[in-house]
């Protein structure tokens, strides 16, 4: 559990640093990370089911990402987080929006082309 917390902190720090690199978007990677942080245990297969707080964060993030630049930025942040988490279960990541009852216009994966997100 301590290792998972260290990893979450590392990802959060990376997202804060990477956030200003791209941006006409209002969303920062720090913001995105904050919304999906409750999902880390589930995505790393330490939780058997998607936590309610995770789905609340996914839903809130989806509601915030209204413009194409915001959706592309959220996508970039999620792809970056997926690549930074070596223990992530990619099938769980890809299925997370559906598990939370949210439709997003792209698949969460380590290789998603976020420039194609509209």
From Swiss-Prot:
Supply the Pfam families for this chain.
Tryp_alpha_amyl
Question: What keywords appear on the UniProt entry?
Answer: Disulfide bond, Lipid-binding, Signal, Transport
Which InterPro entries does this one have?
Bifun_inhib/LTP/seed_sf (IPR036312), Bifunc_inhib/LTP/seed_store (IPR016140), Plant_nsLTP (IPR000528)
Q: Which domain of life is it from?
A: Eukaryota
Entry-linked SMART domains: AAI
Q: Which family does it belong to?
A: Belongs to the plant LTP family.
Q: Which PANTHER family does this UniProt record tie to the protein?
A: NON-SPECIFIC LIPID-TRANSFER PROTEIN 2-RELATED (PTHR33076)
Name of this chain's protein? Non-specific lipid-transfer protein D
This chain's source organism reads Brassica oleracea var. italica
